[in-house]
UniProtKB/Swiss-Prot annotation:
InterPro entries per the UniProt record, alphabetical: Dxylulose-5-P_synthase, THDP-binding, Transketo_C/PFOR_II, Transketolase-like_Pyr-bd, Transketolase_BS, Transketolase_C, Transketolase_CS
Residues involved in thiamine diphosphate binding: H72, G113, H114, S115, G145, A146, N173, Y284, E367
GO MF annotation terms: 1-deoxy-D-xylulose-5-phosphate synthase activity; magnesium ion binding; thiamine pyrophosphate binding
Species whose genome carries this gene: Bacillus pumilus (strain SAFR-032)
Record flagged with keyword Lipoprotein: no
Gene Ontology CC, one term: cytosol
Co-factor: note: Binds 1 Mg(2+) ion per subunit. Binds 1 thiamine pyrophosphate per subunit.
Reaction(s) catalysed by this chain's protein: D-glyceraldehyde 3-phosphate + pyruvate + H(+) = 1-deoxy-D-xylulose 5-phosphate + CO2
Protein name in UniProt: 1-deoxy-D-xylulose-5-phosphate synthase
NCBIfam families attached to this UniProt entry: dxs (TIGR00204), PRK05444.2-2 (NF003933)
GO terms, biological process: 1-deoxy-D-xylulose 5-phosphate biosynthetic process; isopentenyl diphosphate biosynthetic process, methylerythritol 4-phosphate pathway; terpenoid biosynthetic process; thiamine biosynthetic process
């Protein structure tokens, strides 16, 4: 079938199961070939082909609402709703988004990127439907990994209590990104092996209705037998107790089973949970055999071998550098423990976990719990390292503030993927952490200029005993600089001058140091002397150096790959105001007050005006123009 010609999913209504099987094979081949060039979330999407097709055949999108939790598994949905011709632009600048996008299609009714939000969104839509008196079906599709998120459980509790008509699709592939952990995962494992509970329950009810009633005694006995068999057949009937009608488990790759259960769910009043078993990566052997999450999301790859197409790294990844430095220090200090909310692979903690399994905690998709658990460990004189992506740290704001900072506990937070991350887009850009971390009392916040300084910052954080400390570091690899053999500690709140200058000064840190140095060198050719300062401590500021700069009265330019509102530049302005030095000329460069879309980091920096060219132009505007000499002077 020509998948690029699909306009909407109505063509599915008249197709037989055999034709749908052929369509599924075509879709899988399309995804494998397309993502081999662009990269993307191949594993999750190969696993939901039949489920997505079945949903669009049985229901009527966009009238009926599909809410894809996390959203990385929505490629098949995009294909069936007329966006196949755009797949060659997937996750590229101004191209097809890798997640549902409301302004991209009327079929995308809920935008996602972070996990565990679909059930709460669905509850809101169901409540609105009932208030308006309409009759659409609401169908959140949530994975077994996302179901471990606290927000999802809060929503289950409310939905079950309100008894709203809703069909929750539990896409159970036994993985989120990495293999799932926790008691809910264990419970779902029991359900997978328990058989079809709903069929047994219906048969029992039919049987009991045929037994002649002898007073109320037999009826009561029959009900007790039914309840006992329920718990015998399905250990831990969590969803039924929450108020849901539980259906399944169902083979998520069998159209016959999917159609039977989806039609049953349509006729059932109140909230229904359909438990669907799928195979992540189905149809492509390298992805299907993946046990640790390597094929969850990838770059380009060779179809025949499954080898990834990427240049040999000249330097270690930032995640690897940080985790391996922590691991090295853990050999000398048994109090060091590592915590990750479901990202052991992305955070490169596999080596730590293998060497120190009793000191490694993957808590699942539970950022709030991870932060407060770190606080608990710190109260017992342990040294917790919380490895967390910047975008997911947003979800633990209150726990960092209330449980870690307020108690002034020695927790080291490694803020991975800080700054622009590129193709994953606006839900994943790590640009807000400075603004929400720097106002927290007791918090130290820093970012290194390169991987050598990075390893020393990790050591500084581990040795720091005066409260919480956080280190930001970007996605990708280091710069390939020479690494010191001996680890050092860096004085808290100390900056360093990287390039001398007397006409103006740039205050910056991390990834934007390179463009600052390049701009300073360009202006040097024009006879302008610009100082570049590595403001590696975002909090506390180096007040001694700042005071010296203010005494010189020269213009100041701050640069940050983070939001300007409440950011590093704001802290410098606040300091200057408090010092009654408002006559100093100050300009700030950074991320504007908007969400930054997907695309390459270079393209995004160009779009927002954060390049060496714009830095140089800004400095030229700030510096006084030398007076022209007259003729004969």
């Amino acid at each position: 079938m020509d998948l690029l010609s699909i306009k909407n999913p109505t063509f599915l209504k008249g197709m037989s199961n055999a034709e749908l099987e052929e369509l599924s094979a075509d879709i899988r081949m399309f995804l494998i070939e397309s993502l081999a060039n662009s990269g993307g979330h191949i594993g999750p999407n190969l696993g939901v082909v039949e489920l997505t097709v079945a949903l669009h055949k049985v229901f009527d999108s966009p009238k009926d609402k599909f809410l894809w939790d996390v959203g990385h598994q929505s490629y098949v949905h995009k294909l069936l709703t007329g966006r196949g011709s755009e797949f060659d632009t997937l996750r590229q600048y101004k191209g097809l988004c890798g997640f549902p996008k409301r302004n991209e299609s009327e079929h995308d009714v809920w935008e996602t990127g972070h996990s565990s939000t679909s059930l709460s969104g669905a509850m809101g839509m169901a409540a609105a439907r009932d208030i308006k008196g309409t009759d659409e079906y609401i169908l959140p599709i949530i994975g077994d990994g996302a179901l471990t998120g606290g927000m999802a459980l809060e929503a289950l509790n409310h939905i079950g209590d309100e008894k709203k008509d809703m069909i929750v699709i539990l896409n159970d592939n036994e993985m989120s990104i990495a293999p799932n952990v926790g008691a809910i995962h264990t419970m779902l494992g029991r359900l997978r092996t328990a058989g079809k509970y709903q069929w047994v329950k219906d048969e029992l009810e039919y049987l009991f209705k045929r037994i002649p009633a002898v007073g109320g005694k037999l009826a009561a006995t029959a009900e007790r037998i039914k309840d006992s068999l329920k718990y015998l057949l399905v250990s831990g009937m969590f969803f039924e107790e929450m108020g849901f009608t539980y259906l399944g488990p169902v083979d998520g790759h069998s159209y016959e089973d999917l159609f039977e259960n989806l039609e049953y769910a349509k006729k059932t009043k109140g909230p229904v949970l359909l438990h669907v078993i799928t195979k992540k990566g189905k149809g492509y052997q390298p992805a299907e055999s993946d046990k640790i999450g390597t094929w969850h999301g990838t770059g380009p790859y060779k179809i025949d071998t499954g080898d990834f197409v990427k240049p040999a790294a000249a330097a270690p990844s930032w995640s690897g550098l940080v985790s391996e430095t922590v691991r090295k220090l853990a050999r000398e200090d048994e109090r060091i423990v590592a915590i990750t909310p479901a990202m052991p692979v992305g955070s490169k903690l596999e080596g730590f976990a293998k060497e120190f399994p009793e000191r490694m905690f993957d808590v699942g998709i539970a950022e709030q719990h991870a932060a407060t658990m770190a606080a608990g460990l710190a109260t017992q004189n342990m040294k917790p390292f919380l490895a967390i992506y910047s975008t997911f740290l947003q979800r633990a704001y209150d726990q960092v503030l209330h449980d870690i900072c307020r108690q002034n506990l020695n927790v080291f937070i490694g803020i991975d993927r800080a700054g622009l991350v590129g193709a994953d887009g606006e839900t994943h850009q790590g640009v807000f952490d400075i603004a929400f971390m720097r106002h927290m009392p007791n918090m130290v916040l820093m970012m290194p200029k390169d991987e050598n300084e990075g390893q020393h910052m990790v050591n500084t954080a581990i040795q720091y005993d005066d409260g919480p400390i956080a280190m930001r570091f970007p996605r990708g690899n280091g710069l390939g600089v020479k690494m010191d053999e001996q680890l050092k500690t860096i004085p808290i709140g100390s900056w360093e001058v990287l390039h001398p200058g007397k006409d103006a000064v740039i205050l910056t840190f991390g990834t934007t140091i390179k463009m600052a140095l390049q701009a300073a060198e360009e202006l040097q050719k024009e006879g302008k002397s610009v100082r570049v300062v590595n403001a590696r401590f975002i909090k506390p500021l180096d007040e001694a150096m700042l005071n010296d700069i203010l005494s010189e009265g020269i213009p100041i330019l701050t640069i940050e790959e983070a939001v300007l509102q409440g950011g590093f530049g704001s802290s410098v302005l606040e300091y200057i105001h408090d010092k009654k030095a408002s006559h100093i000329k100050v300009e700030r460069m950074g991320i504007p007050d908007e969400f930054i879309e997907h695309g390459s980091v270079d393209a995004l920096l160009e779009e927002i005006g954060l390049t060496k060219v714009q830095v140089a132009d800004t400095l030229r505007d700030m510096l006084p123009v030398a007076p022209r000499k007259g003729i004969g002077s």
